[in-house]
């Protein structure tokens, strides 16, 4: 079956280190010159998608595997002096500028649109942001999209407090449809049939006290994610999307 890529969107789920699966898929797309006019990514999917949109094959894999092995950029030690479980200085300053420079010009000149999903802490709703001119804003959006709740500081974009987009929209296929792409390729990082435990999550009273709507969506994120998974499987069965996912459970933690 030949795909009409001119009218298809690309949706990239997050998932932290499970995103190495996405890296392989995107490198395959680049090897075969498969390009989409529109893409949208969440958290790790946003970061990996940026390298795809700048046509830098292997860059996302390097950041997820090689750079992790060399620099060990995830750990409790970073909470001490960066207030984050991730070495955000390495990831969003040193890596894109020095270790494996991001090709901003190639990204800017790519006619395809690319949106990244964040969660607005004030409203508890998803924000869909894109940037093709301002390097600092682009990095801020990517950082916000990947700022895990509880273990990463809030990131400000356009003066608004933001956290990981996966809190409210982990698989933003409906956003792609709203943007005019009725058919989509959806790259997932969980096997078909996976569901999260829907135990009630009680957000400690002393956390995010300034953001009551954020607290509400954090308490419901498992239910919302499971609803999205059910929708994705239904749309796949109906032939409305092409889902690319691991065949078996990925045995790796989100931040392992």
Q: What do these predicted ranges mean?
A:
Residues 1-42, 50-256:
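Patatin-like phospholipase
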